[in-house]
């Protein structure tokens, strides 16, 4: 698509960016719905958090790993936020929301609902594995091997939590 064609559809660079963020919000919600996971914070839908099991979280985590690494749109968005987080407070906030504090808080809330002690610390460890493997995947020649290692690591963590 040429720049001219792009600007015929959008008013400005800001409009393009806002549409990208909106699409990410939609896709995030769709992923959660597809795996019967809460779409929003625990305060907004506490009953949905009560219905999640560790096995549900493992399946959802595997799907999110594929989404953030294999989906062209999501992967490009993740990489863009990683680079742009240092250029503005807005990008830093989005980076935190989508890739650091947001997911870690989400996992903590799920762990608390499941009844896991020290939920905050264990959620940080759980999400750290996801984040680490995103980076491993990006630089790997054998991406399937990294994906398999990720699944194994997540399953091991969950076994320790049971």
Please provide the spans of the model-predicted regions:
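Helix-turn-helix
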Residues: 1-23
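Hydrophobic/aromatic residues within well-ordered alpha-helical segments
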Residues: 13, 20, 24, 28, ...
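Hydrophobic recognition helices of helix-based DNA-binding modules
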Residues: 17-20, 24, 28, 32, ...
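Hydrophobic alpha-helical connector segments
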Residues: 19, 32-71, 122-126
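Amphipathic alpha-helical packing segments from all-alpha helical-bundle domains
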Residues: 55, 69-115, 124
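Short alpha-helical scaffolding segments that buttress acidic/His motifs in well-ordered protein cores
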Residues: 61-64, 78-82, 126-133
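Secondary-structure edge/capping motif, primarily at the C-terminal ends of alpha-helices
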Residues: 68, 85, 137-141
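Hydrophobic/aromatic-rich alpha-helical bundle segments in the mid-to-C-terminal region
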Residues: 93, 97, 101, 110-157
């Amino acid at each position: 698509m040429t720049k001219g064609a792009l600007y015929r559809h959008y008013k400005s660079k800001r409009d393009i960016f806002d549409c990208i963020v909106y699409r990410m919000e939609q896709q995030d919600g769709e992923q959660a719905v597809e795996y019967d996971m809460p779409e929003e914070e625990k305060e907004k839908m506490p009953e949905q958090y009560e219905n999640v099991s560790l096995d549900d979280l493992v399946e959802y985590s595997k799907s999110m790993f594929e989404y953030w690494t294999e989906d062209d749109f999501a992967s490009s968005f993740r990489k863009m936020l990683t680079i742009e987080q240092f250029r503005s407070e807005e990008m830093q906030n989005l980076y935190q929301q989508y890739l650091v504090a947001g997911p870690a808080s989400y996992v903590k809330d799920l762990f608390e609902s499941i009844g896991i002690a020290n939920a905050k610390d264990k959620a940080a460890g759980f999400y750290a594995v996801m984040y680490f493997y995103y980076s491993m995947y990006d630089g790997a020649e054998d991406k399937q091997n990294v994906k398999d290692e990720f699944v194994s690591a997540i399953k091991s963590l969950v076994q320790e939590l049971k």
